[in-house]
Amino acid sequence: DQVTTPQVVNHVNSNNQAQQMAQKLDQDSIQLRNIKDNVQGTDYEKPVNEAITSVEKLKTSLRANSETVYDLNSIGSRVEALTDVIEAITFSTQHLANKVSQANIDMGFGITKLVIRILDPFASVDSIKAQVNDVKALEQKVLTYPDLKPTDRATIYTKSKLDKEIWNTRFTRDKKVLNVKEFKVYNTLNKAITHAVGVQLNPNVTVQQVDQEIVTLQAALQTALK
């Protein structure tokens, strides 16, 4: 019988570990590219783009094996930290849309610092974990920031809710109104969509006006579907 040496076992384990990390990075890449479309023009656009760069560099490092610029022992921590980046961005888009702009500015900055640390080949595992903890603490801190008042100028995050409503309305219109309902119904709904786009593009529109436009557009769609 052949005797399996510790070196062979370690090599197999390392290969399995590298394969698992590569699969995780592929998943992260898909998630980040999906998020990218939703954060254009926001405080999260830069960290998302840099996180995508991190994924590609780590994938290259895993393929390069011993030639990597990263310490192989630290790659696992970097991959784990990328998951924390994705979770932090998701948290921000879900919970900070109605907060004052500073909440998103601070959160975007904190996430960017974490991504930079992941990218830094000289960053230690401890320093990466410390930055992850800083981001988690920041999540709790920004939740205490004031909410936007109805009379405050709408932020890009407030407007994103209207933007989604516009796209959803267009999609439903093309599927259930166009060539299904009479032209008058189609035309009336189009006017409501055009008005909503005007509100969204208005740099001085208030939170209250955006919220009201969402309600108006939803009502226009329901009327068209009757």
From Swiss-Prot:
GO CC terms: extracellular region
Subcellular location: Secreted
A GO molecular function held by the record: IgG binding
Keywords recorded for this protein, A-Z: IgG-binding protein, Repeat, Secreted
Ranges for region IgG constant region-binding: 37-100
Ranges of the Sequence repeats in the UniProt entry: 158-168, 169-179, 180-190
Spans through the membrane: none
UniProt-recorded name of the protein: Protein B
